[in-house]
Amino acid sequence: MAYLPQHIGNVLQEAAINKTALTKGMIVRMRYKRLDGKSKEYWVLILQPRWRGPTDENYLIHALNLDALPIAEFFRLVEETGVIGSKSLWKDRRLDVEKLQLDMSSRRFYNSNLKDAKVLGSAYRTYLFKNVASVRVCDYNFGTSVEDFGIED
């Protein structure tokens, strides 16, 4: 089932950013050139913005595809992790954008939240960093039930 329309309804505003400015926890809309050469737009939650393993040639973006992520599961994840303001975006661009607080390492987050969760695991994707053409960070309405833990990256 496609969950993207539900998520798009919660986006308050967007702003273009450089892909090198991506950080964990951001919700972004990105234009991505797939391996078949076709370009497509994806809305994702960034888990690891630029990762390269010891045998990898290219950097990878690890993310959750919002189109495959039910909004109830997304808000459960938000409740578990918390929300913070993005200090770097405020400092550089004066953008007041909140993101998920992903304090732990990407491996620990994957093992504790995604590995055994069928719904979250099915939304997990990797994207080649070099194939990302454009990025727009989204200010997502997390609602009033989530506590804001302050502004820090």
Where are these regions (language model features)?
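Mixed-charge, Lys/Arg-rich low-complexity intrinsically disordered regions
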Residues: 1-23
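Short coil-to-beta transition motif at edge beta-strands of beta-rich domains
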Residues: 18-37
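Hydrophobic beta-strand residues in large extracellular and virion-surface proteins
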Residues: 25-30, 44-46, 61-63, 135
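Short regulatory "switch" loops immediately downstream of catalytic or recognition motifs
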Residues: 30-34, 49-52, 67-70, 74
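Short beta-strand-centered aromatic/proline hotspots
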Residues: 37-53
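Short, solvent-exposed secondary-structure boundary/capping segments
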Residues: 52-66
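Intrinsically disordered, low-complexity, charged/polar segments
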Residues: 65-153
